Amino acid sequence: MERRPFGPVPREVPVIGQGTWYIDDAHRPTAVAALRRGLDLGMTHIDTAEMYGDAEIVVGEAIAGRRDEVFLVSKVLPTNASRAGTVAACERSLARLRTDRLDCYLLHWPGSHPLEETFAGFERLREQGKILSWGLSNFDVPDLDAAWKAGGEGRIACNQVLYHLGERAIEHAVLPWCEEHGVAVVAYSPFGHGDFPGPRTPGGRVLEEIAARHGATARQVVLRFLVRRPSLLAIPKASSAEHAADNAAAGALRLTDAELARIDAAFPLAPRPRRLPML
């Protein structure tokens, strides 16, 4: 599995990781098996959040006995992101995950608490060894500028954002900003939200043709397209061990410049929206 830098963090992570949104305790055995299969195949970057319900508990079971292999990320809700609230939320997440540390802790989206307070909480956790690094999620350029000035300069590890073929808004300004400032960009929901292009659509046919040329699947082609720039990482969710294996295979896929151009033309970048989209 190809590995890339994670902002200023002194550790590289796999280009394809594992997301856990909508994983719940009702499907625990299947979810645990999928996550463990992903680990076996090198997808050691696992992303979760306190907002995801039982996901942290499921992740804790999946990584039991393998914690040192994992680059573990969770997120604090903006409503909890005061200085003391950030520390308390992290400690609750650590308990659910059954670990003593996170590799990165994110503010889930901009909220009402001053960023200086949240970042002070992050730094307190880092000093205590409970987190290695910290970052952001769903931050547009004005929010990123504010975060940089509020104490984030040289410290923001990543910005996790919505990014898929039908939603390429980050390419207008967010992605260039992050690249200029040395911040990793992590794509969540890389297959969209129930709107993955079907094989009979014009764009879907392009994906299928390219996939056939490589002995791959359309989803693997999409993942590879989304991480075509060195600053990009992706965290698809897998519903089964087989699905995890399919996602992992995208890490070894290589697309030609001509193929990347075909995909780019089939799913063109839309005009810049007023706000950065998020789920």
Model-derived segments and spans:
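Beta/alpha (TIM)-barrel catalytic core signal, keyed to glycine-rich beta->alpha loops juxtaposed to Asp/Glu
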Residues: 3, 110-279
